Amino acid sequence: MHIRFALALFFSLASTSVASTAAPLAASSDATYGALQTLASEITFTWAKMHPLDATSLGLSDEDGKLETPSLAANARDLAAIVGWERELAAIPLSDATLVDRDDARLLHAELVQYERGLTQTKRFEKDPAAPGRDVTDAIFVQFQQLPIVGRDGATAADAALAWRKIVSRLAAAPGYIKAAEALVTHPGHLYGVVGSQSLAGVPDFLGGALTDAAKTQVSPEMFAAFVDARDATIAAIAHEKREIDAHVASWPENYVMGRAAYDAMLRDEQLLPFTSVDVERMAHDELAHGWAVQSWVEDRALAAKTPIGPLSGGGLAPGGPALIAYYRDRIAQLTSFVATQSVVDVPAWLGNVDVVETPKFQQPTSPGASMRSPLLFSKNSTGYYFITPPASLEEAAKRLDANEDFDRDRILSTGAHEAMPGHFMQGSIARRHPDFVRKTQDSGVFAEGWAFYGEELFVQLGLYGGDLDARYYTAQWERVRGARAIVDPELASGAMNYDVAVTFFEKQTGFTHAASQAAVAGIALYPGYVISYTVGRYQLEALLADYRERMGAAATLHDFHTRLLSYGTTPFAIVGPELLADLGRPLADVRASANY
């Protein structure tokens, strides 16, 4: 599944001989390195202090009981801080800096550009009427997942009580936060409203269900009474938010289009991509065509073998009901063993565990398939959460070969390789340990999704599925999905394609149900620039692999390449590529140690 058209190589660096005694690329200990690290830390922790919901997503639990008060004045404060950080960054001397220091400066600049454009150009806070209630609920859900379990990892009863007090405190402040944030929604968008209303409809299921059930057994009667009061007030505020959306959404215009020039600027300045939207669409069309071709080959083989595509050629139907969660855990264990026995990449002994859970209803409208929440950046908790939405009927999902509902062993293995081992869970767990603060805090979707997508076909080639055909078919299905996404994304963002046309195109090219296609296209429209990460990231990774093999010659191995690749953080390939190639003179153990991997 290689991309087969010529684009200029995105690496530009002096040739480095593998046999040379190249100096390590570990960041220098001079004033430049120190200044960059200090600035990165200041940006991260100051922003988290100003935005407690962001702090929670990072695992900075000291802010878990707090909420900001959204306002235009707060936005002006944020913008002033960003401009100040940009001045500080520009003042750091780079003329004699190491490659790592220069790259860290590029990464910080890209981060600040993204922050600034969010306030001055994108202005999502003006468009999304459901964001206030949804964002609070998302944060409470993260806190719920991170609740200390007394006796585990040294957690005490006092730790658990404190965590619950923070949940109650945040819930109590939520109605005020929601009201203040709603006042900033001066240009609500139709699609934002439609999708947002669907998300808000699922909030009571979580707040009044799983969260309340946990509170009943874990807090004192006095705290439970306070919890119920705060919960009910939050549910009422969110219900009011939903009613307002439902009453007016039909009259709101579509306002998710950003324009092609702005989209290309995002790729260049924020994602550090050497491609325009036109380049991305060419890649995507190639990927889509290749997915259809592979599917045709597999169908032909199945016809000749008189073996139907599906569970009979995919390791058997997965069990339904409560047994499904345990089945997923067994498949992740199988993947972990396969990665080790096939020497795919170094699996660190310190790696945490994956907990398989059902996707909350309030997240399902924009996340109908599987997803992974890797361990939070600064949390002591090393558990990753693998979200699945169990099919209403595995048998019915199998009949329609539903790409979003993993119904047999091999499909669960394929998705598990992407989401967990060696995909997002393992890669994210390694990245958060990086000693360079700039690298530790990187969150490049292009790198993360490129690595996970690359692994899907890799496992087919390495023989994980033996002679079974369904995994090959499924891999081709998802190559089509990634290609279709990367076509729809720039077309929607530029305004060249409207929502209805995009849904029709997407449904035809992916085989998704109409409802799943609507959800997928809505997510693409409202979060431009993300879904191209799979296509572009895999392309850049494979191009880097080709350069690595050329440099290393007979000494090249996939194990060495993969382990080196995961030693630079969740960082754009424009940064990782040159650094990895320049580091080839260093022993693998040295590179891995420099990343605290």
Region locations from a protein language model:
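N-terminal maturation segment of proteins
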Residues: 23-597
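Bacterial N-terminal signal peptides
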Residues: 6-17
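Positively charged n-region of N-terminal signal peptides that target proteins for export
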Residues: 1-4
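Low-complexity, intrinsically disordered segments with a bias for serine/threonine
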Residues: 16-24
